[in-house]
Amino acid sequence: MNKNKNYINKNYWESYYSKKKSPQKRSSFALFCKKHVRNYKGTIIDLGCGNGRDTFYFNKLNLKCIGIDKSKVIISKNKKKKKSDFILFKRKNFSKCNFDKMVNNKFSIYSRFILHAIDENTEKKLFKNILSSKKLEYLFIEARSINDKLYGIGKKVGNHAYITTHYRRFIDPKKLKSKLSMFFNIKYFNEAVGYSKLKHDNPSLIRVIAKRK
């Protein structure tokens, strides 16, 4: 992501978490993933964890969790709220993280609303980073599709990418599935509306559960 787009996104999210009361209840995607992670023995790494609502939710299921976010404001708040030794919050650029060094055991990546918040170059770095890991087991992904009603709104800044109050890059489900299938066994892949309604927003979302080959 170029410096201008990164600046817009950083300012937006720092302001969002500083001034606005973001949802505290676990997301519908976290609830969807519950049956798949309930007895998981590894660590759940929540990329772009925000206020940690899903990270905390998974921790309440007795899972080891690490929440990663670039926002200094929100990571500081999350650290103050945490009450368990089995949950950590780190301020990091997840596209550059050495995930194997962060955990002592196997881990899975939980990525909700993250793929559509980063540009193609950052996505490539992230997947290259993830695929280099020897401890990765599962991917859990939820992201806005190119079929979402917000597609095309705002200033176009790249392929399927637009800026309104912040940056969004809508994901092509066919390309995503093709890319993941090279390295993962797809356990679940679907696109639908109704997954995450919030006031007047009812996005078209892609949901993925995939296991490393």
Description of each model-found segment:
Residues 134:
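Hydrophobic pocket-lining residues that define ligand/cofactor binding sites across diverse proteins
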Residues 1-101, 118-125, 129, 137-213:
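Class I (Rossmann-like) S-adenosyl-L-methionine-dependent methyltransferase catalytic domain
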Residues 110:
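A conserved beta-strand element that flanks and buttresses the S-adenosyl-L-methionine
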Residues 114:
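Hydrophobic adenine-recognition pocket in adenosine-nucleotide-binding enzymes
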